Amino acid sequence: MSATAATAPPAAPAGEGGPPAPPPNLTSNRRLQQTQAQVDEVVDIMRVNVDKVLERDQKLSELDDRADALQAGASQFETSAAKLKRKYWWKNLKMMIILGVICAIILIIIIVYFST
């Protein structure tokens, strides 16, 4: 090795060509502010999410109430329909009996009229 190579100044570390580095306190404060801003953003997002969850819960409760009311109405309709069906079945049966009696009377009249 030559003597000039030994006396050459050491190579500058990469990145030292720009402005001087900020003091460590300033860098810490900047990082702290960035972190605080991120935390604030996350808190805002979580507040919005909680509000949405509460709205969803309220809507689900309303939907559940409406479903219960609909179920009660359906049950009442089913009962009313069964009663109405039975009522008209009896009316139909009465009509068939009356029609049968009328046919029997007409048949008896015809038999009596032609047998003499």
UniProtKB/Swiss-Prot annotation:
Residues modified to N-acetylserine: S2
Effect of S28A: Significant loss of phosphorylation
Entry keyword Transmembrane helix: yes
Gene Ontology MF terms: calcium-dependent protein binding; calmodulin binding; phospholipid binding; SNAP receptor activity; SNARE binding; syntaxin binding; syntaxin-1 binding
Entry membrane topology: Single-pass type IV membrane protein
Record-linked Gene3D superfamilies: 1.20.5.110
Residues at the site labelled (Microbial infection) Cleavage: Q58, K59, Q76, F77
Post-translational modification: Phosphorylated by PRKCZ in vitro and this phosphorylation is increased in the presence of WDFY2. (Microbial infection) Targeted and hydrolyzed by C.botulinum neurotoxin type B (BoNT/B, botB) which hydrolyzes the 76-Gln-|-Phe-77 bond and probably inhibits neurotransmitter release.
Database matches in Pfam families: Synaptobrevin
Transmembrane residue ranges: 95-114
Compartment(s) of residence: Cytoplasmic vesicle, Secretory vesicle, Synaptic vesicle membrane; Cell membrane
Domain v-SNARE coiled-coil homology: 31-91
CDD domains on file: R-SNARE_VAMP2 (cd15870)
InterPro entries attached to this UniProt entry: Synaptobrevin-like, Synaptobrevin/VAMP, V_SNARE_CC
Segments of this protein annotated with the region Required for interaction with SEPT8: 92-116
Keyword entries, A-Z: Acetylation, Cell membrane, Coiled coil, Cytoplasmic vesicle, Disease variant, Intellectual disability, Membrane, Phosphoprotein, Synapse, Transmembrane, Transmembrane helix
Function summary: Involved in the targeting and/or fusion of transport vesicles to their target membrane. Major SNARE protein of synaptic vesicles which mediates fusion of synaptic vesicles to release neurotransmitters. Essential for fast vesicular exocytosis and activity-dependent neurotransmitter release as well as fast endocytosis that mediates rapid reuse of synaptic vesicles. Modulates the gating characteristics of the delayed rectifier voltage-dependent potassium channel KCNB1.
Clinical condition linked: Neurodevelopmental disorder with hypotonia and autistic features with or without hyperkinetic movements: An autosomal dominant disorder characterized by axial hypotonia apparent at birth, global developmental delay, intellectual disability, seizures, and autistic features. Involuntary hyperkinetic movements are present in some patients.
Entry similarity comment: Belongs to the synaptobrevin family.
Protein name as annotated: Vesicle-associated membrane protein 2
Protein species of origin: Homo sapiens
